[in-house]
Design a protein with these regions (language model features):
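Membrane-proximal intracellular helices of multi-pass ion channels
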Residues: 2-369
């Protein structure tokens, strides 16, 4: 689920491969995996399962039957994995490394077989990985649109535009802040783009030591940990579409204060966002930050500062993997007690299942029937 360190960085090759496979299965979602291979999938239950893993506020049916949708998603997922493996092999990367990197990149899990992550490899492997991290930060429904030649839907995607603007904007600010540290413009563009996409996709590979970046850069990257990539991607975080709806909802609240008699509707991709969806997004945001605060308090009992505790909570909830040590931005958990580790593990599951499907298990109403 999350790229974390501190439980031992040296494993046998079998363990490394198994870890990458679990990354890969979890990337698209265990529920979608089961739905894809289930012999029978009822429409009501299958739609709930698909929304649990691809819950974006505007989650739409790719094709009429949910089981067919899940199979289509996995066909795209598998194809992207195979293509990346082939490209890495063509670049001279060993087969074992290519397979593990590809499984962890397409799933945005971020596990690597080398302790210093992608910094162990050359620019070619990093650039290939950058491309696939970017693709897997996008909604898989866009890939379906490409296959169906529905390019108008892609052009109308406000979330895709926001994703491009955020990535390029943060990369530009990072480049300005660290311009004097790089030997060339090309080197600076490469590392800043790689780090921005790595964080917003919640993959969390590194192409350069994390301590290289300034506190200002890490402040921006922490915000990206929270927002995450597009809805319907394999990444974690709140998702950009939710953030966009939250911003529009806040603006509407201000507008209603100024002009209370006016009708203010929230639009996304040219469509009106239903009030139930807006309410669900607002509830998700409240639940997310309540979990961050609760985790930070628990970790403070373990001796961590509130800042480090909140960073660890955000990292776990967003399935990123950076966080506990604010000086090195690595997530070392070996020094934490069992309660703190359990809370972080719960946060990882909570974030991976988009909070509410996990909380449903603990709701009294669930067990009354």
């Amino acid at each position: 689920l999350v790229r974390s360190r501190g439980l031992g960085d040296v494993y046998k090759r079998q363990i490394l491969l198994w870890r990458s496979i679990t990354n890969w299965i979890g990337g698209m979602g265990v529920l979608v995996f089961l739905l894809a291979i289930a012999p029978v999938a009822r429409e009501g239950g299958s739609m709930f399962l698909l929304r649990a893993e691809f819950p974006g506020p505007m989650a739409a049916k790719l094709v009429p039957r949910m089981q067919k949708s899940a199979k289509l998603l996995y066909e795209i997922y598998i194809a992207m994995t195979v293509v990346q493996i082939v490209l890495l092999l063509l670049g001279g990367i060993p087969l074992f490394d290519s397979v593990n990197i590809s499984l962890s990149t397409v799933s945005t899990g971020g596990f690597c077989v080398r302790n210093d992550s992608m910094a162990s490899y050359g620019a070619y492997a990093q650039n290939v990985t950058l491309v696939f991290m970017t693709l897997c930060s996008m909604s898989f429904s866009l890939f379906y649109c490409v296959l169906a030649l529905e390019f108008l839907r892609i052009r109308r995607s406000r979330e895709l535009r926001a994703f491009v603007v955020v990535v390029l904007g943060v990369a530009l600010l990072m480049g300005i802040d660290t311009a004097s540290k790089f030997t060339s413009v090309a080197d600076g563009v490469h590392h800043t783009l790689f780090q921005v996409v790595s964080i917003i996709s919640t993959t969390c590979y590194v192409s350069i030591d994390a301590s290289f970046w300034s506190p200002f850069v890490w402040a921006m990257l922490t915000v990206l940990m929270i927002t995450g990539p597009m809805s319907g991607s394999t990444g974690g975080g709140m998702k950009l579409s939710r953030v966009m709806i939250l911003c529009k909802s806040t603006y509407r609240a201000i507008a209603r204060t100024v002009t209370p008699n006016s009708v203010h509707l929230i639009h996304l991709d040219g469509e009106i966002v239903e009030e139930d969806t807006v309410s669900a997004v607002e509830s998700f945001a409240v639940a997310y930050f309540m979990a961050v605060i609760f985790t930070a308090v628990v970790l403070s009992i373990n001796g961590l500062s509130i800042g480090d505790g909140m960073l660890a909570a955000i990292s776990s909830l967003s399935n990123v993997g950076y966080g506990i040590d604010s000086n090195t931005f690595t997530m070392g958990v070996s020094g934490l007690n069992i309660i703190s580790k359990a809370v972080l593990c719960f946060d990882m599951f909570l974030g991976r299942l988009e909070i509410f499907p996990m909380l449903v298990l603990f709701a009294p109403e669930t067990w009354r029937k």
